[in-house]
Amino acid sequence: MLYKGDTLYLDWLEDGIAELVFDAPGSVNKLDTATVASLGQALEVLEKQHDLKGLLLRSNKAAFIVGADITEFLSLFLVPEEQLSQWLHFANSVFNRLEDLPVPTLAAVNGYALGGGCECVLATDYRLATPDLRIGLPETKLGIMPGFGGSVRLPRMLGADSALEIIAAGKDVGAEHALKIGLVDGVVKQEKLIEGAIAVLRQAITGDLDWRAKRQPKLEPLKLSKIEAAMSFTIAKGMVAQTAGKHYPAPMTAVKTIEAAARFGREEALNLENKSFVPLAHTNEARALVGIFLNDQYVKGKAKKLTKDIETPKQAAVLGAGIMGGGIAYQSAWKGVPVIMKDINDKSLNLGMTEAAKLLNKQLERGKIGGLKLAGVISTIHPTLDYAGFDRVDVVVEAVVENPKVKKAVLAETEQKVRPETVLASNTSTIPIGELASALERPENFCGMHFFNPVHRMPLVEIIRGEKSSDETIAKVVAWASKMGKTPIVVNDCPGFFVNRVLFPYFAGFSQLLRDGADFRKVDKVMEKQFGWPMGPAYLLDVVGIDTAHHAQAVMAAGFPQRMQKEYRDAIDALFDASRFGQKNGLGFWRYKEDSKGKPKKEEDAAVDDLLASVSQPKRDFSDDEIIARMMIPMINEVVRCLEEGIIASPAEADMALVYGLGFPPFHGGAFRWLDTQGSAKYLDMAQQYQHLGPLYEVPEGLRDKARHNEPYYPPVEPARPVGSLKTA
């Protein structure tokens, strides 16, 4: 053994070839600060070996290196800019030493090589991969850019266009694509990987392969003419501006850095990368996006822990077909859980099957599946008008009309047709689970399972624990949701649960703005362009359905009369009374017509202004800040109340439910991350300016207490240790 660290070791392999093996404790390798330091120490040993002829890098895990240790990021991002820059210089000196070894080097890459793992293998001369490879640079999705030379080496290896596509979009690619663009030099089966790697190294050692020529382009300026450079970077900047926008600075910074570094060799280019990375790491956007990544890991880890002793359901059923039922049936079947889809009439069943078939055909058109796979999946969805087969069902989700009487009747009837241990769930969006459970003989086997529309796209499923729901019931439904590829978050029961409970105060803020003379078009524009929502409130109401919102608004008002009971007729009432239900019937705040792809396209409709005039004061202008404050304060206050009341268990789960269920702008990180970024005291000062607007604008006492003590909702993060300590970690 030449060297042994905590996460990697160095040893002779055979005949002058050494192997550097990443083998961290635990299930995966991460390129954390300690591993970077250890890699430097291993290279120091290697540089003294006069008999060295070649170096093989490999992993002892199922994945090569999954990336940097994201859990270190928030503390690293708090290090002063100069110290962070120094540490990056140190880390890059390690990868430069790997790249500058006087012998050929090869990385044998299996599984994932992402972020820092990808940047590590870019420093070698050759790369062999297994068919399960996923390699790429996802840093821009975390609000930063590659910092270990990825923005320097990748363009010089692949050319500007392919590299920009990967870096700006934060993409990873599979083995076949990586081979096609030159990111890897060959793809071999796992059992042949080491044998193949040694064979390539031997060819390089004997001179049959020119490893020096392979290495040289990575050390030089990017080979692009002025015209080629202008075309590549102009197109890339245009696409990034269109897709990322002003709220996500990392992709544009990465493109501009690659452009600026194109005319320099490695050292100067790395300096430019460093100068771009450090300011990005100190942005609120980076902290928010890293926070989302960590919260996502926390939420999924919690679901995994909850279901560790639970068998995933083998047979499911959906009550109620149509678009929602068909979407749930598709998602279950697509992920491998057969499903019975029951309805009371053929028309609805046909609609549900058509929806499932349409979604499968889209997968076929995109090349994700073949005809046999499509036929196999669709055959596991069994439409029926009766309860045949329900005696073998493990879990049933009810998705009938949002009417408590109908839901109770359907659930009570179904309970008599299934085994005693079968779990029942309701896809209700607002009706309390306790109310629906009152119709059942076994309420302990019942809970809520709230999907979001469209089911196949929306990642969140709210799992609602009723007062009598058993732990096993919750675990079974969480297991099914996880199997469907969803992110389940368990919440406690109340009207609207978590997501809709906090959404309707937001809509109430919108209604009050319109009542006071705001133009809904400007409100939408501000909330989309300035705050960052994917849809403004008027457009969102049209998509949800004005009739749906009108009904849910009444349910919420009954559940929380002290805050959500209206004392005036609002815009939702006016549109509902005029049968303007939104996209579903082509008339809402906007008029809708289908475009060439059959998708609804919104158009101005002057008639709506006359309609809204009956429930509004004369039009007046509001500042962007005032619109944002009046829209967001009711939502934020209700989110805080949900945490204080135990409806949601943690800030992390609340923020992920908002991001995954409502599209809360990820660059804000969620409501609690947004609060922490602003500071509770600053938020309180803002909110108090609007408390005259009513109970929805009254800040909860717990938030006031946070402001008094200057406390964040997330645990405070300490800056990483000084750079000197990081080097020798």
Curated annotation (Swiss-Prot):
Residues 311-729 are annotated as: 3-hydroxyacyl-CoA dehydrogenase. GO terms for molecular function: 3-hydroxybutyryl-CoA epimerase activity; delta(3)-delta(2)-enoyl-CoA isomerase activity; enoyl-CoA hydratase activity; long-chain-3-hydroxyacyl-CoA dehydrogenase activity; NAD+ binding. Signal peptide: none annotated. Keywords: Fatty acid metabolism, Isomerase, Lipid degradation, Lipid metabolism, Lyase, Multifunctional enzyme, NAD, Oxidoreductase. GO terms for cellular component: fatty acid beta-oxidation multienzyme complex. PANTHER family: TRIFUNCTIONAL ENZYME SUBUNIT ALPHA (PTHR43612), TRIFUNCTIONAL ENZYME SUBUNIT ALPHA, MITOCHONDRIAL (PTHR43612:SF3). This is Fatty acid oxidation complex subunit alpha. The gene is fadB.
